[in-house]
């Protein structure tokens, strides 16, 4: 029986318009009402992930930064696996060599070692064109984008960030030019103690080797006394592979997932635009109800046998 449902966010829980559908919202609430744990396992930072849950009036625990930090429903962080500053320095040096913008996640949330104008230029020239090319939505409104920018913590250069005590959870970047991102990937793989994955052809996410969605999910399940066989995990992209390749009760790929993701999963769900997450939840609840009926019938049969 499934006791923990773990869902990726972009391309999975969210549809291509960037929000959680009414059917999926109702399914998640019903799942939680039946006592089954629901957790979001995302590459987003806490604020960006919570923004979407708040818009849907949903609340749950979250694994953010692709496994680097887990948050309870109140926003308290635990199970933290940050990048050592020495490793972060190597990564940032490689980024500089390739002219890559360093999109950094720390305990402050989104963090930058450049100025605001450079950040805005990065989104205009790299992120937005890449997201548009994929047909996805990351910010539903300009207000959402403006709010994100207003929350960014700016440092004066990498030495300023590396010299403070704040932990670095993740360093990522996006290039609209795929040749540039591929060259960066080749260079990054020469650094030890890191885990580098992509959610699309245009991006790169880097965390500590112990900060992976799969590792974080198993750690979280242990705190709830839930075994791997009682977990359903669903996702669509490369940063989901560490959890979808685990020996879990069910591993599901969305219909819109990459071929690599589909190859490691036991189930293919409908796409994120066809309420794939809701479909999986409804199936779980239906199976649980059927199992409950069988148990009731069995108990009733035993009672009659004693007459």
What do these predicted regions represent?
Residues 1-4, 15, 20-21, 189, ...:
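Mg2+-dependent phosphoryl-transfer enzymes with acidic/Ser/Thr/Gly-rich catalytic loops
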Residues 18-34, 81-87, 153-157, 180, ...:
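Short, acidic loop-to-helix structural element flanking the phosphoryl-transfer center
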Residues 22-136:
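Active-site phosphate-binding/coordination module
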Residues 31, 42, 66, 171, ...:
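Residue-level signal for inorganic ion chemistry
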Residues 35-39, 59-60, 170, 229-230, ...:
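Short active-site oxyanion
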Residues 37, 101, 195, 250, ...:
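Residue-level detector of anion-binding/catalytic polar loops
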